[in-house]
């Protein structure tokens, strides 16, 4: 990503969007059980989510879910997760370079920190509004329990879209847009800008070449910084999206209820699976993204040479 440090032909916007979407979907498939564990830990202690089963730690949560609800439960909501990455990650990551160039007006080499942050803000914000319905369905599918005696709210992904729209309202599919917007603005800026800066520093100071080890290390650093900053907003977003109608009058009310009933530590519930998930997700996505861009451009150049 993001600022090229080589003389290779630059990927087109279409190549970047396609590469981002494919890489994000692959990363989501591999790391989805960690995301499900994160959601369960985040809603633990909430009124409607309380049960006799307590989740402890990342592996403990995954093991408990597999034993009590079956292995498929770890991937409940995956179709919505894939839809989310297609509509969300492909735009926020794929358009980042193009928007960054727009803000720098092509005059800054390399682009300034302000241009990078502005690009992250814009692409993250636009992507949230487009992909929010998939986020709502994904979280609710991950949060609902299939334990004996508890009737699931939804029988499947598409049933969830229909039930939410008909029994609550169409606007409910955009429930939690405010905290999700805050979360993803933080994530997009921190993730992309940190990765961009880290990669640039490693390459420009000749510590690592612009290749897989550089991409891997940059992605890990970006994942940790992003998780640390986004965790409080992420927990509030998950609680608010998963809440029953009228449970929380507003996002601030949800945050205040968490603080008064569970204390400040509640805002960092699920931090370990969040970092494991986001760190591993970043590594898979960014490494695949970089390599896929290169291979697609090589293929395009080969086709151009033969025609």
Curated annotation (Swiss-Prot):
Solcar repeats lie at residues 11-102, 111-201, 210-295. Fatty acid 16:0 binds at residues 56, 269. It is found in: Mitochondrion inner membrane. The keyword Transmembrane helix applies. Residues 33-73, 134-178, 233-266 are mitochondrial matrix. GO terms for molecular function: cardiolipin binding; GDP binding; GTP binding; long-chain fatty acid binding; oxidative phosphorylation uncoupler activity; proton transmembrane transporter activity; purine ribonucleotide binding; transmembrane transporter activity. Brown adipose tissue. This is Mitochondrial brown fat uncoupling protein 1. It comes from Rattus norvegicus. The lineage of its organism: Eukaryota, Metazoa, Chordata, Craniata, Vertebrata.
